[in-house]
Amino acid sequence: MTNRNYRMYGLVPYNLSPIQQGIQFGHAVVEYTNDHFHDEEYQQWAKNDKTFIILNGGTTNNTRLKEGTLNLYLIEVIEQGIPVGEFSEPDLGDQLTAFVFLVDDRVFDKEAWPDYAGGYYADMRTPIAEDYYNWKMKFAETEKEADRIIWLRSFLKNFKLA
């Protein structure tokens, strides 16, 4: 088992009833389980943590010319190399109705892992490179893993509970 705490985060369409959102989220968790059952992180979450965070993912539309926000968010998460479980509901025209992914405490525990509070350049938007690098490397042993964690923290700030 890992020393991390995990939560299963997921996005669902805004226009489903709360019970339908929960059911679709559950379907996606089953898909995640099918693909990642033997992963250490999944086992830690399933045996010890068991927390769901269901977020409003906006619209769903599989049409390539006008994809829904849920579909676009899924693409973003996959492009970051984050393992996902996704579900498309046959009774809703096979539209994407949920996707889920595990998040560890470095993303959601802002008390133990605070946001960047270092210096900024004169434009007040760009963090001082050395300060920022030192801050982000507290999250992981590799820069790639630290960048993934920082990306998830930034990504999840955009959502509200479903």
Outline where the language-model segments fall.
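Short basic, glycine-rich beta-strand/loop surfaces that mediate nucleic-acid
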Residues: 9-11, 48-66, 70-162
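Residue-identity detector for glutamine
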Residues: 20-24, 43-44, 80, 95
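Short amphipathic beta-strand starts and helix->beta connectors
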Residues: 33-41, 79-86
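Active-site pocket-lining segment
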Residues: 37-51
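Glycine- and Gly-Pro-enriched alpha-helical subdomains that act as flexible
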Residues: 2-38
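Sterically constrained small-residue positions within well-ordered secondary structures
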Residues: 1, 44, 90-92
